[in-house]
Amino acid sequence: MNPFHQRHFLRLLDFSSAEIHALLKLAAELKSTKKSGTEKALLTGKNIVLIFEKDSTRTRCSFEVAAYDQGANITYLGPSGNQIGHKESIKDTARILGRMYDGIQYRGYAQTIVESLAKYAGVPVWNGLTDEFHPTQLLADLLTIQEHQPEKPLSEIKFAYLGDARNNMGNTMLEAAALTGMDVRLIAPEKYWPNAALVTECQKLAEKTGGKITLTENITEGVKNTDFLYTDVWVSMGEPKDVWQQRVHLLKPYQVNMDVVSMTGNPQVKFLHCLPAFHDEETALGKQLAAEFNMYGGLEVTNEVFESEHSIVFDQGENRLHTIKAVMVATLANDLKI
């Protein structure tokens, strides 16, 4: 029996700890069969629509390659290629797409949008990213952690995130900690801590799983003895410059650099980043930010750390493919045994 069949994937807390581990196991198996050339197509004849109100590289490519590998057909609707919320309501869009497609991916803005799609579509809906949550990213992160710490269960992992912790990554890390029993430290100015209600919800669940959730402004204490360091971009294209000024000023001390790596006391500590990263001046925005704030050689992470042996960001990026494939297969394959 497949307990995931026809279910949505909107946020991690929609699943139990055992179910998250089952998805990770399936992702590892699918990755292994792809690498060995023995992968079986379980989604032949399925039609999938990818709705992107925000552009993406990793998420789009992961869904497309995963679908192709599994024999499914895809339709891509980009930021200018759909009428959602403009000329057609979310409710109406969901009901028509649900008649045409077997699964719907949404990457965009409010969590309420993907939840509305799920409510009315009648087919599985997957959250590729919203302002509040990024569950496919955290699933890839957990698989990467398992691969690089195979001798430790997730419940024994110490994990530190530095920077803007009130965003979709910080929120989803709270959920991951609560479900897996990890020791997760969110290290940020208090202004950039996650919503208090979500913190409380996740802390209550963590008490049952053995997880530990810490919010702190203290970098030295926060990163001590951690197995993994993680950060995300501080600014996004399209945000007003006065927001940049305030945010970079407050977050500059939380940059992941070699001093922070040393503070962990763990010479084998690994570095994670959901990408893209402003670690050098080789992009237009990276160059602009470096000049604006006199932070050459990296913003949220230094190029030295990003390119070091500590960095596993490209293993992490690749695992988007395998974990997204696991979600698609688990929710669409009728006869899958998990």
Curated annotation (Swiss-Prot):
Keywords: Amino-acid biosynthesis, Arginine biosynthesis, Cytoplasm, Transferase. It catalyses: carbamoyl phosphate + L-ornithine = L-citrulline + phosphate + H(+). Carbamoyl phosphate binds at S56, T57, R58, T59, Q83, R107, H134, P135, T136, Q137, C274, L275, R320. It is an enzyme of class 2 (transferase). InterPro entries: Asp/Orn_carbamoyltranf_P-bd, Asp/Orn_carbamoylTrfase, Asp/Orn_carbamoylTrfase_sf, Asp_carbamoyltransf_Asp/Orn-bd, Orn/put_carbamltrans, OTCase_ArgI. GO terms for cellular component: cytoplasm. One of its GO terms (molecular function) is ornithine carbamoyltransferase activity. Belongs to the aspartate/ornithine carbamoyltransferase superfamily. OTCase family. Reversibly catalyzes the transfer of the carbamoyl group from carbamoyl phosphate (CP) to the N(epsilon) atom of ornithine (ORN) to produce L-citrulline. This is Ornithine carbamoyltransferase.
